[in-house]
Amino acid sequence: MNLGRVGEELAVRFLKERGHDILEQNFRFAHGEIDIISFYKGVLIFTEVKTRRSDRYGRPMEAVDSFKRRQIYTTAEYFLSTQSIRYHSTRFDVIEVFIGEQSMIHYIKNAFNGNDLEA
């Protein structure tokens, strides 16, 4: 299993332990992918997972640049268009997973929103 897949599995477990209902994993659309889509306390959450062995080359969150955010946002719009249920509240989160002697998870709620997208 590759590093990214391990990180995603740890992130799913992390979210489930906190009461999230996991709706989708690796939801793909022509313009992108969303690692985890979950529902928690009335909020539909789109989560990007970034996994690293260290922060030697920067924080994993830094890899979620404006291009990646736009891909996630566009894919989320597509996901919402396929649902018969109308979600009134959505959120975009990032989970940083560090794999090493001691694995660590850093959960960033509201990491970005539609207003963060650059043209």
Language-model-detected regions and their locations in the chain:
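Acidic-basic catalytic patches of nuclease active cores, encompassing PD-(D/E)XK
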Residues: 1-25
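Conserved catalytic cores of phosphodiester-cleaving nucleases, focusing on short active-site segments
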Residues: 15, 36-53, 64, 72
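The start of beta-strands in P-loop NTPase/AAA+ ATPase cores
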Residues: 19-23, 30, 43, 88
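Anionic group-transfer/hydrolysis microenvironments
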Residues: 26, 37, 50-52, 95-98, ...
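Short acidic/glycine-enriched loop/turn segments that link adjacent beta-strands
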Residues: 29-32, 101
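A short acidic, helix-capping loop that chelates divalent metal ions and anchors anionic groups
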Residues: 55-59
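Mid-chain, well-packed structural core segment of small domains
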Residues: 60-88
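Domain-level recognition of nuclease-like catalytic cores that cleave nucleotide substrates
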Residues: 82-119
